[in-house]
Regions:
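Non-catalytic alpha-helical scaffolds and adjoining flexible linkers that form interface surfaces
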Residues: 1-192
Length: 192
């Protein structure tokens, strides 16, 4: 955590720099948990998020804050995050957001070592597009005999589409969102 002393003062040099989702290069000093911000320099290039895109950005930040260890660098994930912010800012229609959010959630879980198994079930059998599955934590997809046999049911096509990041099918979008919500809740485990 950084403390920005005097940042709210009208003549503060850093007042306009400390905005959400803007890249800044910072310098700090101090010891312990709370450090003091010494310098901040705007890196530019990131359009401001507004509307639904802003809420999506906050969602990404919440996931990162709660799931990543403090002060642990994840360069690939940060690159994915900056691309995601650019896509959110560039898409006022909101059509791409669901697909991008699922993609980011998958990348985050993979970076944390919880990569999803989506192309074969827990027995090692390839996923069948018309079969029904439930996703068991730390185990992967388990094939069901009937759709009603479990609470979190997805069709095989959804798992394969999620693997390929193809969200053109409305059922895939709906089931992927529900599945990823369940997975995120499991890994957050009360950290919300």
């Amino acid at each position: 955590a950084l403390l920005a002393r005097g940042a709210r003062r009208p003549r503060s040099a850093i007042r306009g720099l400390l905005m959400a989702f803007q890249p800044i290069e910072i310098g700090w000093a101090g010891k312990g948990e709370v450090l003091t911000l010494m310098k901040a320099e705007w890196q530019g290039g990131q359009p401001l998020l507004c509307g639904e895109a802003l809420f999506c950005g906050y969602y990404l930040n919440e996931l990162l804050m709660h799931l990543l260890p403090r002060e642990d660098a994840h360069e690939q994930l940060f690159a994915h995050y900056t691309k995601m912010l650019a896509r959110l800012a560039a898409d006022p229609s909101g059509k791409v957001r669901e697909a991008d959010l699922r993609s980011f959630e998958k990348a985050l879980l993979k970076e944390l070592g919880y990569g999803l198994t989506l192309n074969h079930d827990s027995a090692g059998t390839p996923i069948l597009t018309e079969a029904f599955y439930t996703y068991r934590m730390e185990q992967g997809p388990v094939r069901l005999e009937h759709e009603e046999a479990a609470t979190q049911v997805v069709i095989g096509k959804t798992l394969l589409d999620l693997e390929a990041e193809d969200f053109t099918d409305p059922r895939t979008r709906y089931e992927s969102k529900a599945l990823m919500r369940t997975l995120m809740a499991y890994y957050l485990a009360g950290k919300e």
